[in-house]
């Protein structure tokens, strides 16, 4: 008989001591995905985990004491909210260690956001994804998100963000 041991990923709130590791992880994930080079202005925003504190819930995925993913969950009145409305929440800055892509960590973080929003009585989750990230579009559609074209927007010329939404039943 073959026994298979699997590692357990724990989703928990960000702690002060996590900030440097999460900043590096976010920067690496977004750069590896081709969203910017390390000197891009958006890189500073992605890297600024400390600046996001107090503007939403920062969750991390940890495995065997190593941070392998992170996400920010924010309400519609957060300065970080981009497309959510009063009865919605959204998550931002989803990042997974590039060496761990495809292992369910991103899905676990998204599910944690959805569960937290649902527990607060929020009926829907919204997100926006850059138009050139077809892999992310497929990922979110697989998780039950649908396009919300009326929420598409451009933070700056040439950067097209597509709105997505999921009902939290």
Language-model segments: which ranges?
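Conserved GNAT acetyl-CoA-binding A-motif
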Residues: 110, 117-128
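Conserved N-terminal entry element of GNAT/NAT acetyltransferase domains
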Residues: 1-20, 169
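Active-site acidic-Proline motif in GNAT/NAT acetyltransferases
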Residues: 97-99, 103, 131-132
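Rossmann-like NAD(H)/NADP(H) cofactor-binding core
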Residues: 12, 92, 126
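Acetyl-CoA-dependent GNAT
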Residues: 16-99, 110-111, 116, 167-168
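Short alpha-helical segment within the catalytic ATP-binding CA
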Residues: 104, 108
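C-terminal "cap" of GNAT-fold acetyltransferases
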Residues: 25-28, 47, 58-59, 87-89, ...
């Amino acid at each position: 008989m073959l026994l298979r041991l699997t590692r357990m990923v724990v989703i928990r709130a960000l702690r002060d001591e996590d900030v440097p590791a999460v900043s590096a992880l976010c920067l690496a994930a977004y750069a590896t995905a081709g969203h910017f080079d390390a000197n891009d202005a958006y890189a500073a925003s992605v890297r600024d985990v400390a600046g996001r504190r107090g503007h939403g819930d920062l969750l991390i995925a940890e495995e065997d004491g190593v941070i392998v993913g992170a996400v920010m969950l924010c309400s519609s009145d957060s300065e970080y909210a981009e497309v959510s409305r009063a009865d919605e929440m959204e998550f931002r800055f989803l990042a997974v260690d590039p060496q761990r892509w495809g292992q369910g960590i991103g899905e676990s973080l998204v599910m944690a956001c959805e569960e937290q929003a649902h527990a607060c009585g929020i009926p829907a989750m919204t997100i926006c994804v850059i138009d050139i990230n077809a892999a992310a579009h497929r990922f979110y559609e697989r998780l039950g998100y649908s396009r919300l074209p009326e929420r598409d927007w451009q933070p700056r010329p040439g950067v097209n963000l597509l709105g997505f939404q999921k009902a939290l039943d």
